[in-house]
From Swiss-Prot:
Protein name: SCAN domain-containing protein 1
GO annotations of cellular component type: nucleus
Region of interest (Disordered), ranges: 1-104
Biased composition (Low complexity): 52-80
Domain SCAN box, first and last residues per copy: 108-166
Organism, as annotated: Homo sapiens
GO biological process: positive regulation of DNA-templated transcription
Keywords per UniProt: Nucleus
Assembly mode: Interacts with ZNF202.
Pfam families reported in the protein's UniProt record: SCAN
Length: 179
């Protein structure tokens, strides 16, 4: 470590020390002494699993010294917060009056009212529509059959005459129409 002290004094940063100047770096023919004083080499860290990206390159495993110098280069303070798209921000907004959660009708309206001009290009529009559809249809908790039922009911309400639509809305919503 004596060889690195002038470099540390000149640069003020251990990150500027070349790796070959660090203790234990480079090729040495003598094994390092562990804390007990024997001349046996220290136990190496466990080998990475073959499926990991570092499996073929054992040198890619950071040493504690390299990790410490990398930590000194990290910026101090909070990381910049990215602005979430409007649809995601609205979905995370506080619940409405009386602590009610946003229902499927709210998410359906957001999906149906989305316009291409709200997005920055076709890929972003696709991504936002996909997210809005997931919030509305909830494929994580609903079956395909339930999702189809929701879509058919919505389309039926859209094509029914006004009088029939008013009667349909007053009826029970748990009655299935497709089977």
């Amino acid at each position: 470590m004596a060889a690195t002290e002038p470099i540390l004094a000149a640069t003020g940063s251990p990150a500027a020390v070349p790796p070959e100047k660090l203790e234990g770096a480079g090729s040495s023919s003598a094994p390092e002494r562990n804390c007990v004083g024997s001349s046996l080499p220290e136990a190496s860290p466990p080998a990475p699993e073959p499926s990991s990206p570092n499996a073929a390159v054992p040198e890619a495993i950071p040493t504690p010294r390299a990790a410490a110098s990398a930590a000194l280069e990290l910026p101090l303070g909070p990381a910049p917060v990215s602005v979430a798209p409007q649809a995601e921000a609205e979905a995370r907004s506080t619940p409405g009056p009386a602590g009610s959660r946003l229902g499927p009708e709210t998410f359906r309206q957001r999906f149906r009212q989305f316009r291409y001009q709200d997005a920055a290009g076709p890929r972003e529009a696709f991504r936002q529509l996909r997210e809005l559809s997931r919030q509305w249809l909830r494929p994580d908790i609903r079956t395909k059959e339930q999702i189809v039922e929701m879509l058919v009911q919505e389309q039926l309400l859209a094509i029914l005459p006004e009088a029939a639509r008013a009667r349909r809305i007053r009826r029970r919503t748990d009655v299935r129409i497709t089977g």
